[in-house]
């Protein structure tokens, strides 16, 4: 053990800011703990292996322990030993034999090495026992950083919500097999920031890259024992530190992250982080002591009121952060502010967001944390997206978050999947979901963008697998099929998995286009899962959280069909962006506007007439039209905006349906801009109002009314502009599969090309 250094080595320093702050002359160390009796600062060598000094923090102010170390510099590796009672039955688990990470550390060095010494109790015995082994040599260390970075001309894109299209991806998986990324940069922040990668994302037309968790995290020992890893990263142990495994040069991971953000911003792309403030990697009472548990277990975690030895588990991970404690709320908001200001990210997706607003008696829409995000000068201008559920009582809260927040909408996912699968009785629900789910979100002045629509996400089937598998195939996860959802609302179109049957292949391709077009043409904010635009597969694995291999990695070896699908997605995105009526801020009501003599939306039966009330829930009704009247786009002085009138027709029947094109004020002809059934998916044919259009079974068609008025020049230009833009090719990766990709694909369990 290194010698204990007198307190006099440290001056009193400051309780704020929390964490380790270098000012060029020394480092201020500050750590919150309401229940500790003493805190020791432990300094380590440059490799983070040898403990050099142990110094007691000299001051305690407002429940914060602090001290200033002159001549300390950036690059200093450190940790803490926190003294206090070890009384699990009272909620206290202090153990100074365990080195703990600073919750505010901006960087980590090294990796957790699973050993009995990292547990506060004697592993294999009762958690009431006290373990005296030193954990330091098995622990990663916190590191002091110099945050200096030259941003240059970088500017935040500030994409308006109505133009936002989210693109969910994984830093490692997106470029691990990318042929244009140098091998040493693949799977890193630097790889994601490469020009070839950024150019592809930009040309696709999405606006905001949503990254799966990049906070420092831990892989559970049971996964390592199986030769697996925590690939997704939903197991955070540091909310300020980017995980060094995503860096080409781990010692400078924070700078590499900033460089990636700058490159994406230069292209006008936003960066959204998936953040996990609901639990930590320390698990339940049988978990390790890595940070929060050993610093102040009673403050950081929600414990059972009648027996604080045990943790409330509303997350399914073993513990739940205590968002009723002011200091925990402060830590989370400080973390968000750090990423928004110092790291310049543009928004956040909150995993299990209900947790963040839980109080003693359940979810509270007026919770201080939710309100503080909206009032904070740095956070109020970012995009705030909640995953509005957890597994606790009353945890499902879709539509329950306050104004200013957007929410993942799983009702959209399930309804759209069921409709295109051919489930009966989905017509009414489908109309609601196409209208931004006003039944959930149209309250308190919220706008339609509050509904984040998705068909697939990281958790579940990819789009290709959704139309190729009826059942999950998670054998590679080593849990005997117990993991992952069993009800996926999927349909394999006749054969489970890959097939050579041309009819089934054609149907699957059309179903993918139907699902993507529905997602991108619905009101609300669309989110695409990266790789869905060219048919990425996970071989039927719907829970690939532990698969850091070709099951999860994006395969950039394209064939003609993959390129064709990506071109289709780009064209539909251009349609959405070209016509504001496809991305309204206001919710659709269908009510008659006497001032404008119009309804903003009409729902049409194949006869071309309004759907009658009695027929909304007709179990045989699987074809209908959504008519969006451009005259309803009124300004504050009740003057119609210059916008298109659009007709979206969806047919989930297996057979052709004759659909009568309605007569509408403002034009006498309908131009077909999109048809998911024909080879290039765009037609540009013109049909007269009143004419009958044959819509193929299981297909979607979009029409725009040809404007007849001389005042509609802008609309004609928008239509022509879309036609011209649609001819530009998308820059795809080289089609040849490199040796590493071939090797990865052949080695990954269960991977077979369709």
Where would I find each of the regions flagged by the language model?
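Carbohydrate-interacting/catalytic domains
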Residues: 1-163, 167, 172, 499, ...
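Conserved, mostly hydrophobic/aromatic
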Residues: 31, 80, 169, 201, ...
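Short, flexible loop/turn elements at secondary-structure junctions
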Residues: 33, 59-61, 71-73, 84, ...
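A generic secondary-structure signal for well-formed alpha-helical elements
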Residues: 76, 84-86, 173-174, 178, ...
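Core domains of carbohydrate- and sulfate-ester-processing enzymes
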Residues: 82-150, 221-229, 234-235, 267, ...
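Substrate-binding/active-site clefts of carbohydrate-active enzymes
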Residues: 135, 170-345, 352-378, 395, ...
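Structural recognition of the beta-strand scaffold that forms the well-ordered cores
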Residues: 165-168, 208-211, 238-240, 347-349, ...
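Conserved alpha/beta catalytic core and glycan-binding cleft of carbohydrate-active enzymes
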Residues: 344, 359, 365-530, 534-535, ...
